[in-house]
Regions:
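Hydrophobic, aromatic-enriched alpha-helical segments typical of multi-pass transmembrane helices
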Residues: 2-233
Length: 233
């Protein structure tokens, strides 16, 4: 089942990988900091609270996210084109969820970046406890709107995963090894496993966990582009 020209799909995958790269770099800017055993969550981190973190980094993260979010559209097009045209309703649902995911990705990216900015700015000025209380209130307030946004994102990638598993896409089932769902679970789980094994807290844990989703999608885009190229020669 091949409904799209391979060259077009390769182009979409490459543009999507670049977009994920921009988003992942933003994640790395937020997560690449010295960690302490007492650090928890996305913003309760000693390095932020001390004011040592550069305030320009969250700003750059949002800028990179805007470019990455735009290029995410090509990820959506590529994923949707993979699904067999016989499943028209499934393709429509997956596509609409994918389009919404583009907006969700930038929204969440900005939300996390602003928490880092507020924590860094407020920590040295009003004290660590007051800063944590203020940013926690901001996080909890925004979470009411943010949490439901994960549903279409999960559906966009979950539907594609199920269709690939069922053999209803243009790819062989072994491509599940490179699927965003597979790699997202892997990248998110490794730091937790390392901590369960009582390994010292390290920067790589934060970076891997924080960038897991964007890195996972980038892995898929690269793998899909390579697959298409190898099957058109």
């Amino acid at each position: 089942m091949k409904t799209e020209k391979p060259k077009k799909l390769i182009r979409w995958c490459i543009l999507g990988a670049v977009g994920c790269g921009f988003m992942a770099v933003g994640d790395w800017l937020l997560g690449c900091i010295p960690l302490r055993e007492t650090d928890t969550g996305l913003f309760n981190r000693a390095y932020y609270l001390s004011g040592s973190y550069g305030l320009w980094k969250p700003v750059l993260t949002v800028g990179l996210g805007a470019v990455g979010g735009f290029l995410y559209y090509f990820v959506v097009k590529a994923l949707n084109a993979d699904i067999d045209t016989k499943y028209r309703k499934t393709k429509i649902i997956q596509y609409l969820c994918g389009i919404f995911t583009v907006a969700v990705a930038l929204t969440i990216h900005t939300w996390v970046a602003t928490m880092a900015w507020f924590t860094t700015y407020l920590g040295p000025r009003i004290g660590e406890e007051a800063a944590i209380a203020a940013v926690t209130a901001y996080q909890d307030g925004m979470l009411l709107a943010i949490a439901p946004m994960y549903v279409p994102m999960i559906l966009a990638f979950g539907i594609h995963f199920v269709m690939l598993l069922a053999g209803k896409t243009r790819y062989s089932r072994w491509m599940l090894a490179f699927h965003p769902v597979t790699w997202n679970l892997l990248l998110a789980a490794v730091p937790d496993i390392a901590q369960a094994m009582q390994m010292p807290v390290a920067t790589w844990m934060s970076v891997m966990s924080q960038s897991s989703t964007n890195s996972a999608i980038m892995v898929w885009c690269i793998a899909a582009a390579v697959y298409e190229r190898s099957h058109t020669q």
